[in-house]
Amino acid sequence: MAKKRANGEGNIRKRKDGRWEGRYTAGYDEKTGKRLIKNVLGKTQAEVKEKLAKAVAEAETVDVRRADEYTLGTWLQTWYELYAKPHLRFSTAEYYRRGIELHIMPRIGDIPLKKLSGRDLQWLYKDLQEHGRLREAQKGKQPGLSDSTIRGIHTMLHNALDRAVKERLIVRNPADDCVPPKIPKHEMKILPPEQIKSYLTAAEQRGVLPMFYLELISGLRKGELVALQWTDLDIENKTISVSKQAGRNNAGEPDITRPKTENSIRKISIPQDAVDLLVAEHQKHPSNPWMFPSPKTDQMYHPDSVVNIHKKILKDTGLEHLRFHDLRHTFATLALQNGVDVKTVSSMLGHFDAGFTLRAYTHVTRQMQERAAEKMGNFMAQVM
């Protein structure tokens, strides 16, 4: 049945108890066609008139009958099953599910969706910061969740409530009013150029030189690196095709998945030395489809296993702590410092655009600008 308009400004009357009441048509039952009558109360006629005008305007925007069906918890469950889970990677979907079931439902899940406020969400974030960790007995761990985890919960809530606005369940998104924690930026570290040789020597002694050499000259993400197969190597054109990464399927089992974005699907040019190393590696296990199979299973390495090998290499050489992801930063930094243009580096990294790369590596581009300024200064000194 077509939606009927709300009942103008509604009707206002004074009740026997002295209060003023305003009644209005909030909508119509889809099955019976009967009007859904709502009311507002106040001490004065002016107060009720103001409330009534707001309620009538809201009734034009919100599907009141459906809005009354949901608490925050039941809406999040509906949103997760219909809009999130079918379109997200398994790991992201699990992250959302745990956030809903473990952190949101026990605290504010019973709040009616239409009454949820930005302050309710802000109190949620505060509580999670102070008492959110479920396993408080973990050594060295604070009782609260990390800022990055809370920020992720905020992003999820914002998306779910945006959907509620689109479905006319609420007038506006209360998450718009929130101030989620800021995520502290990790200090960007790189493997110093003078230590690269000792790092690769240690990798060679552990039998993983081709893998880590390729990492340093390509900046692949760890999931992309372990998912490489021999069919991804083009010997003649000296390229590596990146079209997949290690992930988990819908059953939570290790599997090969597509990268998160289309920009991550790319071809990377590699030097002849890298091609030679990879060909020699292939000759050690010519029938295995994986470029870097695990010696224990002959299957694809788990990304965490590669991180553990990286830590052992650092320990072997006495180098300072460095995340595996910092090898990616090492590639990007050294490429920029050695004159590779930002657009090329961006495409090799699989970034969305060169602007993101510029922002991520501001410290390097600043040095490049200083060198450019010095060169121009020298040039102008010669012509003056």
Annotate each predicted stretch with a short phrase.
Residues 22, 121, 157, 161, ...:
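Short, basic/aromatic-rich helical patch in the C-terminal catalytic core of site-specific tyrosine
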Residues 166, 209, 213, 217-224, ...:
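C-terminal catalytic core of tyrosine-transesterase DNA break-rejoin enzymes
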Residues 4, 15-21, 25-123, 281-291:
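N-terminal DNA-binding module of tyrosine recombinases/phage integrases
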